[in-house]
Amino acid sequence: MIAPEALKALLMNNQVIPVKFAGHRMLLDAGGVLLWPQQDLLIFSDLHLEKGSFLSQFANPLPRFDSKETLKRMHLMMQRYDCGHIVCLGDSLHDGNALSRMQIDDLERLNTLVDSVAKWTWILGNHDPDIPPEILGKRAPLLQIQNVLLVHEPEVLAIVNENAINENCALDSQHVPVEAQIIGHYHPKSSYKLANRKVTGKSFVCGDNILLMPAFGKYTGGLDINDKAFEHMFTRKSALVYLTYHQKIYLL
């Protein structure tokens, strides 16, 4: 885990902002990751590895180096926080054939990252409902940690809790109700007028019981937080938006 002195420096430099979500203290990093110190957990979302090679098949003039860059940035974030558990919130691969296009050294680099921590969980997404066995790590459709659900797309929590209660009754065990969820999928971005210019960046969005992660992948765009797609999750007035820009993070 990151040393207190190093964390203090990040906080003073506006690279990290502390938040309280679902009763837990967490840290949002300008690099697009979430740290849950109490759980020794670092969360990434929407890596979209091999998106460049996918698009280049359709005459899009994009270089095929996005996976290298994404993995390099992942390594830096992992070195920064030194957590024992990594969770990737779905769409880690851009498509079902991503592995066939991935360069051998990139696959080796990915597996080296996975093998460097005690636990690595791939949450499955709509782009990667199956992750090939050549990639190390555990697969799961969702993951509950205490009262928080980690999942790619938002779930109806009442249904999640009902299903869990039924399963736990069969096992004669006690269920901790899910009260909030951390999700990916939407690639939220926001904008802010600064002097004579407007800055736009990937963003975290924190509502009452839902926290949206920004996309981490190199070639991942964003959906403006004012888009109607977000209306069923939160209202703009009720949500806290954290804009990332040039390795800084700001509460709007």
Regions found by a protein language model. Give the residues of each.
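Extended recognition/assembly regions associated with phosphoester-bond processing machinery
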Residues: 1-89, 94-252
